[in-house]
């Protein structure tokens, strides 16, 4: 936006300041600031470290609050001081200062819009690392190949975003693609940014596996859940689970386990199945699998509570859990479209190379 007059600059600078203060109040950031101050004081108490578990929890909460507040602190003073800067610059330079002030306004407005998106990530889970699972639907090789294409898309996105990721479990497909894969993703607001990827991803293309070059439609389910803290109590009864151990079935190479160290846990009441094979130790694989199971069960409880609330308030969900969220059309035209936000692009190649941030941001704006 190009601001062309001194009068308009004064108006938009005060609007930006007011919007920032309103958002600060709405998100209770002053309370978070006080909590962070208290945690900083507590972490400096030498006696805290006599209790390693309490010290770990304090440190974790402190880090989470710092992640949440630092982006706001970074821009806070610039926005609050901007109306005064406008007055001083105009007094000193007159209309000659309008150009540089307009550029500064656009910079601050853009930063504030980014903060508003982060404001949509207000739940504590949004700050957490995430488990991302990709599972092909019916269709054999066709859908398994689509699952592998999505895996590459997400990995490219993580690399661009600066997220760290590790393959927890992967099962190779029959001849091509993958039957199932789970990744652990670590980074700022990892779950918050990825949670909108939950659902069915649909591909339309000319199949490379069809000798007659016919058009095929394939479906893959993506499921994202937050890594849960130990302080969140998720009870798992031994009688409710079945634990299987097996040999790693990765893509091969020197890191494939030659012992039965991979672990699969089935939660019998819910039917949830999780597996981990990336660690050398069966104990470590079991621990990671239990973390994944806790995450899935916690998420299931959260979803039930949300559905009950919507039921009581008379609201109806527009998009059902696990429904089709996005289509990727390679033929007869090029288009990727999100069915929840209507955000779309014809640059399919860029999307498949990890350029999915616009889709993620468009979804966050709806929250």
Curated annotation (Swiss-Prot):
Chain positions found as N5-methylglutamine: 254
Gene Ontology terms, MF aspect: translation release factor activity, codon specific
Family annotation (InterPro entries): PCRF, Pep_chain_release_fac_I, Pep_chain_release_fac_I_sf, PrfB
PTM description: Methylated by PrmC. Methylation increases the termination efficiency of RF2.
Bilayer-crossing regions: none
Primary localisation category: cytoplasm
Pfam families documented for this protein: PCRF (PF03462), RF-1 (PF00472)
SUPFAM superfamilies in UniProt: Release factor (SSF75620)
Subcellular location per the Swiss-Prot or TrEMBL entry: Cytoplasm
Cellular component annotations (GO), alphabetically ordered: cytoplasm
Swiss-Prot/TrEMBL keywords: Cytoplasm, Methylation, Protein biosynthesis
Record's function text: Peptide chain release factor 2 directs the termination of translation in response to the peptide chain termination codons UGA and UAA.
Family: Belongs to the prokaryotic/mitochondrial release factor family.
PANTHER family: CLASS I PEPTIDE CHAIN RELEASE FACTOR, PEPTIDE CHAIN RELEASE FACTOR 2
Protein name (Swiss-Prot/TrEMBL): Peptide chain release factor 2
Gene: prfB
């Amino acid at each position: 936006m190009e601001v062309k007059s001194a009068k308009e600059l004064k108006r938009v600078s005060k609007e930006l300041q007011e919007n920032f203060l309103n958002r600060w109040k709405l998100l209770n950031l002053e309370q978070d600031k006080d909590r962070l101050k208290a945690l900083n004081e507590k972490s400096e108490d030498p006696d805290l470290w006599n209790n390693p578990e309490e010290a770990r929890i304090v440190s974790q909460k402190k880090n989470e609050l710092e992640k949440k507040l630092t982006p706001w602190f970074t821009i806070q003073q610039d926005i609050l001081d901007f109306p005064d800067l406008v007055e001083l610059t105009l007094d000193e330079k007159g209309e000659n200062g309008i150009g540089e002030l307009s550029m500064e306004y656009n910079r601050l407005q853009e930063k504030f819009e980014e903060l508003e998106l982060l404001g949509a990530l207000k739940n504590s889970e949004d700050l957490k690392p995430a488990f991302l699972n990709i599972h092909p639907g019916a269709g054999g090789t066709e859908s398994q190949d689509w699952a592998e294409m999505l895996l590459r898309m997400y990995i490219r996105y993580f690399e661009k975003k600066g997220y760290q990721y590790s393959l927890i479990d992967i099962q190779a497909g029959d001849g091509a693609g993958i039957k199932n894969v789970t990744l652990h993703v670590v980074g700022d607001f990892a779950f918050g940014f990825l949670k909108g990827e939950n659902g069915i991803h649909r591909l339309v293309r000319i199949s490379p596996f069809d000798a007659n070059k016919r058009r095929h439609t394939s479906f893959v389910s993506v499921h994202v859940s937050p890594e849960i803290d130990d302080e969140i109590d998720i009870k798992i009864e031994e009688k409710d689970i079945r634990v299987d151990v097996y040999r790693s079935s990765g893509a091969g190479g020197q890191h494939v386990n030659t012992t039965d160290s991979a672990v699969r846990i089935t939660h019998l009441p819910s039917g949830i199945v999780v597996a981990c094979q990336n660690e050398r130790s069966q104990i470590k694989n079991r621990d990671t699998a239990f973390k994944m199971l806790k995450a899935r069960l916690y998420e299931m409880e959260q979803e039930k509570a949300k559905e009950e609330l919507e039921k009581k308030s008379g609201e109806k969900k527009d998009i059902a859990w696990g429904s089709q969220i996005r289509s990727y059309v390679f033929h007869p035209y090029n288009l990727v479209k999100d069915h929840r936000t209507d955000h779309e692009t014809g640059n399919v190649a860029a999307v498949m190379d990890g350029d999915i941030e616009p889709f993620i941001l468009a979804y966050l704006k709806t929250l």
